[in-house]
Amino acid sequence: MKVIKNKKILKDFILFTVLPFVIPFIVEIPEQLINVRVKWLFIVLIAIFDFYFAYKSLIIKEKNNNREYIQQSIRYSYSGAHEIIERKRDTLSHETEFNMIDVKNNMLPYDIHFHISDICKEFKKVISSITKINNEYITTAFIYRYVYEGCSEKDSQWKRIGGIEPISKCELNNFVKKEDTTYYHIINNNIHYIFGDSKEELAKQGYYHLSGRDEMYNNVGSVFSIKLAFGNNATTFVEGIITVTTHGKFFTENMDIDNASSVLRNMIIDEIFPYYRKLIETELGLLYIRHISK
């Protein structure tokens, strides 16, 4: 690695220092020693050579920056997931220490809703870190419902866990039926996720319902909403949707990389969210088990 780095330093030194430094000396060579046309041909060739490899070097640098950004973001994701597991372990340890576990009355010795909310908050922190947007401009919301065979109408209603995302003064189960919401499209149109760097553009396409809070920020912001579920190979027992929104800030406004929106979308879906998906789906499974055991 050190040898490669030293070669790169030497290459950049030649391209950006030596070659430009040589050109003025070529210009000063007397015509008696070198033909004028040959002299200018050398200068043009050196300039073309320098420009070409300088451009190529910048392209490589941009790719390396993108790669480094993705790797750093994945580290943020892994670190956040690790902290969630540690907090859950500490909660169990604390409750056993003070004899707070009563399996007869509660088969699970911790608050599942609180833990799912904690996972959502940690995911929000990761989004904040990789987009460089302060936490106060980001909100997360998580909703879920039971969909197992034979569940009652009450159980099949959507419920919210944590999150402070305003629902435009509309009751949740009425809100998800609005055709201009991300929830509606994910629930009814078999769309796995919705990602938009501009809420306003999504709203124009009928995929996002602008809220009162959005209007406070002139409808500036981004949204990411994705579906999760717990079940077995035969059926699904419970499903949920996590939504991350920004207010007054776009996901990519602080990202100085090419195709920032596509890079961020693919990175969240393929590299970052899978950590949190497994954590949340596990808790949804425990939520279902506790529910049917009552």
What is each stretch, according to the model?
Residues G206-T236:
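Helix-to-coil/beta transition segments that act as allosteric "coupling" elements at the rims
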Residues V3-I4, M107, N254-N259:
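Short, flexible/disordered intra-domain loops and linkers
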Residues V238-K294:
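Juxtadomain coupling helices with adjacent low-complexity linkers
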Residues V38, L45, F49-I161, R290-K294:
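Intrinsically disordered, low-complexity terminal regulatory regions
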Residues R145-N218:
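Regulatory sensory and allosteric helical modules in signal-transduction proteins
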Residues M1-N64:
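Hydrophobic, helix-forming membrane-interacting segments
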Residues R145-V147, F230-N232, T246-G248:
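Short, flexible loop/turn elements at secondary-structure junctions
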